[in-house]
């Protein structure tokens, strides 16, 4: 059994064609009034995001981090529909769901509403998700599992001959490549001949900055990886009004930058020596307060252009969050098939990020704003920083990352 997740985040002009038939689009009313179960799972999603982030940060303080909490949580919540006993409870508890406070049915209903909302058409923001089940032709799958993953997670099912590993790998990778518009390729590099079932989740984001940077203003500047290492990076620059302020609790500058549509990027620039403090203090409640409060002021902003990739074997890191049984010989996946005992052999997640000046298709577009006469602070993201990408309607953490070295591939 293989579980693979992937995501892609791109700024820039929107593609002319819609995503295609891989992702389902549904009109969704505003979630605050009509989606109480979604409101119930969002805090758990955020805390899962920070728990997973802290585990990855603990493993290495010298590498970039980038992943999609929504993608990983969706894949494992979907998989939990086919698990039983300890395997089942471990997954949901590892995703930070307290089943004494929220019934399991509401967890899955919350994900159903989340996926519906994320896939809602938006003329200014391209955001699509997809779930694919690749099943061995000889595998007899429990009907209820297929029905549940289709109805609750909008999943598509594909019949595959896993004995032909090259062809099966090609099918999975083609599905992924199509879903991410060619940005994530060769997600699955190796496939075991014994594989009978693969679950793939993707999330694709492409947005335009509400207030783009001017390409002409970008210049090469120093980025201080650590006290001994400095690299040259293209630094986007703009003097203007920003939703930015210094948060004493986090010992960090906090910058919120909106995309056109329903997404916001939050950047955290920690004070000297305060990166770990920032990482330990981030919570769902703090993020919610940032999103609800506007703190506009003038600033001279320097933000590096980015192109980073995060690839993770989740078996180890999720083990630290208590999800172990599903990877062991004692796994109970009898809700998927009763043919033979299954275990999750591999869980792969890949995320791709690009941040640049792009943000408008209009040639010669210009944006002017009034700047107070007082000297604005200069805020340079020229040392390791943390960032989040939030979907505004659901307050869901689409992506979370840390930039230690912008030149690291």
From Swiss-Prot:
Belongs to the serpin family. One of its GO terms (cellular component) is extracellular space. Interacts with CELA2A. Interacts with ERGIC3 and LMAN1/ERGIC53. Interacts with PRSS1/Trypsin. Plasma. The gene is SERPINA1. It comes from Papio anubis (Olive baboon). It comes from the Eukaryota. Residues 364-383 are annotated as: RCL. InterPro entries: Serpin_CS (IPR023795), Serpin_dom (IPR023796), Serpin_fam (IPR000215), Serpin_sf (IPR036186), Serpin_sf_1 (IPR042178), Serpin_sf_2 (IPR042185). One of its GO terms (molecular function) is serine-type endopeptidase inhibitor activity. Keywords: Acute phase, Glycoprotein, Phosphoprotein, Protease inhibitor, Secreted, Serine protease inhibitor, Signal. Inhibitor of serine proteases. Its primary target is elastase, but it also has a moderate affinity for plasmin and thrombin. Inhibits trypsin, chymotrypsin and plasminogen activator. The reactive center loop (RCL) extends out from the body of the protein and directs binding to the target protease. The protease cleaves the serpin at the reactive site within the RCL, establishing a covalent linkage between the carboxyl group of the serpin reactive site and the serine hydroxyl of the protease. The resulting inactive serpin-protease complex is highly stable. The lineage of its organism: Eukaryota, Metazoa, Chordata, Craniata, Vertebrata. It is found in: Secreted. Glycans are attached at residues 61, 98, 136, 262. This is Alpha-1-antitrypsin.
């Amino acid at each position: 059994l293989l579980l693979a997740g992937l995501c892609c985040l791109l700024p820039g002009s929107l593609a002319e064609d819609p995503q295609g038939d891989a992702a389902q689009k549904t009109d969704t009313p505003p979630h605050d009034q009509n989606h109480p179960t979604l409101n119930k799972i969002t805090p758990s999603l955020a805390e899962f995001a920070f728990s997973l982030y802290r585990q990855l940060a603990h493993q290495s303080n010298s590498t970039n981090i980038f992943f999609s909490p929504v993608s990983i949580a969706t894949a494992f919540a979907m998989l939990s529909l086919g698990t039983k006993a300890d395997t089942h409870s471990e997954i949901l508890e590892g995703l930070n769901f307290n089943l004494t406070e929220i019934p399991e049915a509401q967890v899955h209903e919350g994900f159903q509403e989340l996926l519906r909302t994320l896939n809602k058409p938006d003329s200014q923001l391209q955001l699509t998700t997809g779930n694919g089940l690749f099943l061995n032709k000889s595998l007899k799958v429990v009907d209820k599992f297929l029905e549940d993953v289709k109805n609750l997670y909008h999943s598509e099912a594909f019949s595959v001959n896993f004995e032909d590993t090259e062809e099966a790998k090609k099918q999975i990778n083609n599905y992924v490549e199509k879903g991410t518009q060619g940005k994530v390729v060769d997600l699955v590099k190796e496939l075991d001949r014994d594989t009978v079932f693969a679950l793939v989740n993707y999330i694709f984001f492409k947005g335009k900055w509400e207030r783009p940077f001017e390409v002409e203003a970008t210049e090469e500047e120093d980025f201080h990886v650590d006290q001994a290492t400095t690299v040259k990076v293209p630094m986007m620059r703009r003097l203007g009004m920003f939703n930015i302020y210094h948060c004493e609790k986090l010992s960090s500058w906090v910058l919120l930058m909106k995309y056109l549509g329903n997404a916001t990027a939050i950047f955290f620039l920690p004070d000297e020596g305060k990166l770990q403090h920032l990482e330990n203090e981030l919570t769902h409640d703090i993020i919610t307060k940032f999103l609800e409060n506007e703190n506009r002021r003038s600033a001279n902003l320097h933000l590096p252009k980015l192109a980073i990739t995060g690839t993770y074997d989740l078996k180890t890191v999720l083990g630290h969050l208590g999800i172990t049984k599903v990877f062991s010989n004692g796994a109970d996946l009898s809700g998927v098939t009763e043919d033979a005992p299954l275990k999750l052999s591999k869980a792969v997640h890949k995320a791709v990020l690009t941040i640049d000046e792009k943000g408008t298709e209009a040639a010669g577009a210009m944006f002017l704003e009034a700047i107070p006469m007082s000297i604005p602070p200069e805020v340079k993201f020229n040392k390791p920083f943390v960032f989040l990408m939030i979907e505004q309607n659901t307050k869901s953490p689409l992506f979370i990352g840390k930039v230690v070295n912008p030149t690291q591939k």
